[in-house]
Amino acid sequence: MDKVTGKAYVLGDNVDTDQIIPAEYLSYNPSIASERKLFGRFALSGVPGDQAGLPEGGKPFVDLADENRTASEFAVVVAGSNFGCGSSREHAPLALAEAGVRAVVATSYARIFFRNSVNGGYVIPAESEEKLVSEIRTGDQVEIDFDNCRLRNLTTSKEYPLRPLGDVAEIIEAGGLFAYARSRKIA
């Protein structure tokens, strides 16, 4: 699997799907390209300001002041436990992907968010063995090596172990559950 490299955006525990993509933006239609991009524009806009972009807080994920901006500068979200809790909302991992996020690294996930991420092929949900929110700062350059189960903070040169993706790795590499089924001639 390819490595993911880019800037990290750090959040705390219990980031729910309403914070990832607030309900007022669910009226956009993801099958219309111009509306699909708006999911990226409003990704993580529901996170309270003091919890956005840790450790300092107050760092917006997407600069909403720029009306033409639909993506973020961050390729990796680093979070604490229970990431993606709340309602079952397939739009949550879609919004992160549309914002340019390629992977989320969290201590644990709400299972429905994890499955929506894998099944839709939106973002790679990696699990850290230790809580990285106190080790990585928003803006740090990180590299995730899925084959060797490591996250390297390129800013500090520290490395951290990740749990293996296991059976879902093949689904992720295929681009989601439907693509995986087609490649296996299941569907």
What is the predicted function of each stretch?
Residues 15-16, 84-91, 172-181:
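Conserved phosphate/anionic-ligand binding catalytic regions in large, soluble enzymes, centered on
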